[in-house]
Design a protein with these regions (language model features):
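N-terminal auxiliary segments of SAM/dcSAM-dependent transferases
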Residues: 2-116
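A short helix-to-beta-strand connector/capping loop
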Residues: 65-69, 104, 123, 180, ...
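Conserved beta-strand elements of the Class I
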Residues: 127-128, 161
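Conserved SAM/SAH cofactor-binding pocket of Class I
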Residues: 133, 137-216
Length: 295
């Protein structure tokens, strides 16, 4: 496959800005990133490159004092997917902050890096993620916080909606914690295929349905969901909040992440205004996770 290489210059450059840019660019087709001194280098398949979508994303960048410019060139031939598949990621451990839960520890790993030196107790849950790309493996703080929030809940018998599923890790986590059913969707076709693949690996494919599309899919959904999780950027969360409110059950739980700590007031105001009660705030670095309950 032929790729474009985009050199992003971020002013001022910070780890937060780099993380946000990689997350947002990933939603418009970018597959791989390398950090540089002044920003990021991103790689996208030439056939999937949508420059207008990228420009719109940059125009709505959440950090108001940050400027982003980029140069485009054709990348040298290189199998980026194969490189990631060979390298994979080291096992990740997520622990519940709440005592007395049935599962206290979640271990996320890939097939090439099996966990070692851990106790396989009933209170430990294992999830294997075969990520053909680096997104949604559990390495990011936002994914870890939502997984932690799920560990701290009683998921038995719940119906779950996973919005912007990526690799499917959140829906799979919910199902392995006892959820009855999960509907997941993602705008990226690769994510849809990868979620289905990971559901098979974790033996929950009979309970997980994956759709290709954006939040507008919820306009035709007839079921209601006890738990709605969304790990998406701030602007999409705000755009789709009314849809989340429509498909959640009374007393249902809404778990949101994918945004910066500074965005908490904006997100909270929007959600509270739609009939939700704030339950919990989690923070990891500069990232945040908010948990709400429908009234």
């Amino acid at each position: 496959m032929k790729y474009f290489e985009l050199e992003f210059t971020i002013t001022p450059c910070s780890q937060v800005a780099q993380d946000l840019l990689s997350a947002l660019a990933g939603e418009v087709g970018f597959e791989t990133f390398e950090e540089s001194q002044n920003g990021l280098t991103g790689y996208v398949q030439q056939s999937l490159f949508d420059e207008s979508a990228l420009q719109q994303t940059l125009a709505c960048f959440p950090l108001d004092d940050t400027q982003i410019k980029y140069d485009v060139r054709e990348a040298e031939d290189r199998d980026w997917n194969e490189q990631w598949e060979q390298e994979g990621f080291e096992p990740i451990e997520v622990r519940s902050e709440r005592s007395g839960v049935s599962v206290e520890t979640l271990i996320i790993h890939d097939g090439r890096h099996l966990p070692s030196d851990i106790s396989y107790l009933p209170s430990t849950l294992m999830i294997e993620i075969d990520a053909h790309l680096a997104f949604g493996t559990g390495t990011h703080e936002t994914t870890q916080m939502i997984c932690q929030a799920l560990l701290e809940m009683d998921m038995k018998g719940r119906w779950v909606l996973d919005c912007g599923c990526g690799t499917g890790i959140l829906g799979i986590c919910a199902l392995k914690l006892g959820a009855k059913k999960c509907l997941a969707y993602d705008i990226d076709e690769w994510s849809v295929d990868n979620t289905r693949h990971n559901a098979v690996i974790n033996q929950v494919d009979d309970k997980l349905t994956v759709l290709h599309g954006d939040g507008s899919l919820l306009d035709s959904v007839k079921d209601s969901y006890d738990v709605v999780v969304a790990n998406i950027n701030r602007n999409i969360l705000l755009q789709d909040m009314s849809r989340f409110a429509t498909v959640i059950t009374p007393q249902g739980i809404l778990i949101l992440s994918g945004f910066y700590e500074a965005d908490i007031p904006l997100i909270s105001e929007k959600v509270n205004g739609m009939g939700f009660w704030h339950l919990k705030t989690k923070k990891n670095g500069d990232w945040a996770c908010l948990v709400f309950q429908a009234l």
